């Protein structure tokens, strides 16, 4: 009977997911992923979907104001 490491190696070759948890590179921890402000806005958005359009419109107005001010 092959030992566990041997089984692990053959399993990897076959392309089956490893039983050991491997960190996915494209999914960093939340602290790196988004700032607290982003998280807060997202929580608000999830609670009130209608808010999202208003926030985006407000951001666009803000950007336009900044651009015209320059």
From Swiss-Prot:
Name the record gives this protein: Prokaryotic ubiquitin-like protein UBact
Disulfide topology: none
Record location of the Isoglutamyl lysine isopeptide (Glu-Lys) (interchain with K-? in acceptor proteins) cross-link: 70
GO MF term list: protein tag activity
Record-stated family: Belongs to the ubiquitin-like protein UBact family.
Record field: compositional bias (Basic and acidic residues): 1-15, 24-50
Keywords, sorted A to Z: Isopeptide bond, Ubl conjugation pathway
Signal peptide from the UniProt entry: none
HAMAP family: UBact (MF_02133)
Keyword ATP-binding among record annotations: no
Region named Disordered: 1-70
Task performed by this protein: May function as a protein modifier covalently attached to lysine residues of substrate proteins. This may serve to target the modified proteins for degradation by proteasomes.
């Amino acid at each position: 009977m092959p030992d566990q490491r041997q089984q692990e190696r053959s399993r990897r070759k076959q392309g089956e997911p490893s039983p050991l948890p491997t960190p996915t590179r494209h999914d960093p921890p939340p602290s790196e992923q988004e700032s607290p402000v982003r998280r807060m806005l997202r929580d608000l958005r999830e609670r009130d979907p209608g808010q999202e359009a208003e926030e985006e419109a407000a951001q666009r107005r803000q950007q336009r104001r900044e651009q015209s001010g320059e």
